[in-house]
């Protein structure tokens, strides 16, 4: 395995019960300690398989391992952003340059939010607000699993996990209630930071 590949589970940036009543301590514990850890483990295992195959010159299992890298790698990266995109003191609406860009690209904050909620309702994995460096604009992207439907080259700035393990214990089949709850704890400062990072890099 490359010396640069050393995936680790990051700690939550808040206590496990900090997002209650919107997301329960139990769900955060399962989600972070079991599900996210599983993607970290899967990524590490797939990287090890690829390294072993290169050393042995036997690539029979490499295609499956490469698929596991993208699945688990995207799961790891998106979960890391998802935790950072929430805060016990979050909520409200974006401000400053990010709000200006949302209004420019979507017509209004309400126009963006309605489209994002539609993506979150339809996706089989994630709803993402991304910066598209080719078109130089923000886009909402519904992603199945962790890596199906992603837009090449885009940089996620806001991630909402809509896998059932994210909400079913708290909300049952009412995904819409979970989406509403996310907006009660969303950290727009983190989203603005990711947006500014994207613009400075690509523009």
Curated annotation (Swiss-Prot):
GO MF term list: metal ion binding; superoxide dismutase activity
Known catalytic reactions: 2 superoxide + 2 H(+) = H2O2 + O2
Binding residues for Mn(2+): 31, 79, 161, 165
One Pfam family recorded for the sequence: Sod_Fe_C
UniProt keyword Metal-binding, yes or no: yes
Note describing how the cofactor binds: Binds 1 Mn(2+) ion per subunit.
Entry's EC annotation: 1.15.1.1
Keyword vocabulary terms for this entry: Manganese, Metal-binding, Oxidoreductase
Cofactor section: Mn(2+)
PANTHER family for the chain: SUPEROXIDE DISMUTASE 2 (PTHR11404), SUPEROXIDE DISMUTASE [MN], MITOCHONDRIAL (PTHR11404:SF6)
Function: Destroys superoxide anion radicals which are normally produced within the cells and which are toxic to biological systems.
Record family assignment: Belongs to the iron/manganese superoxide dismutase family.
NCBIfam families: Superox_dis_Halo
Protein known as: Superoxide dismutase [Mn]
Species of the source: Haloarcula marismortui (strain ATCC 43049 / DSM 3752 / JCM 8966 / VKM B-1809) (Halobacterium marismortui)
